Amino acid sequence: LHAPHDSGAYHRSRRTVSALMKQGAQVLIDVHRDSAPAQAYRTEINGQQVARVKLVVGRRNPNSSANLGYAKKVKAFLDQNYPGLAKGIFVGRGVYNQDLRPTSILLEVGSNQTTLGEAKAAVGLFANTLPEITGINPETGARQVSQTADEGSNWRSLGWLIAAVIIGGAGYLLIST
């Protein structure tokens, strides 16, 4: 979506993120692919070969503690519902635009060696978990549990989040293959 992937990519994507936040997005997920051997990122879930995902949190921003807590919540939920999908949490040196929201993560979906189909399958599984992680019922749009404003506000936010993950992920996956 924000090609080329160079030192200016986060500056360019920041405009998109800011626009999504103005429309009500409460959770930010930046989708990438890692550079690693396929076997490091390949697993089988429910009989289907999928790419594994790694959650990345930047430590050089004021939201790093909150983002790490959010990443731990997401990983725990993935581990419970799709064992083996989450490769782990990596705390990196960057900011990754995570200074914009305390519910931000960078998601490495497979590697440049896993297939586009495996990556799409992983994004689909991850997207399936978003309603429960954010506490929003996908059928009614209502909150399922009491939450703070930082954890999600409404169905529209979830819709924008899912759209951003799918569009950004698909765009990046197409560019990187």
Task: Annotate each language-model stretch with its function.
Residues L1-A40:
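Catalytic-core regions of hydrolytic enzymes
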Residues H2-H11, T16-S18, V56-S65, E108-E118:
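Second-shell loop/turn segments in exported
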Residues R12-A19, A66-K73, F77, E118-A121, ...:
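Extracytoplasmic/secreted proteins, especially bacterial periplasmic and envelope-associated proteins
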Residues M21-Q26, R59-A66, P131-V145:
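Generic structural signal for short, solvent-exposed loop/turn connectors between secondary structure elements
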Residues Q26-E108, N112-Q113:
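Membrane-proximal low-complexity regions enriched in glycine and acidic/polar residues
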Residues G88-Q144:
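Active-site-adjacent mobile loop/cap segments within catalytic or ligand-binding domains
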Residues V145-I166:
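Juxtamembrane/start-of-transmembrane alpha-helix segments at the extracytoplasmic/lumenal side
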Residues I166-T177:
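C-terminal membrane-anchoring or membrane-association module
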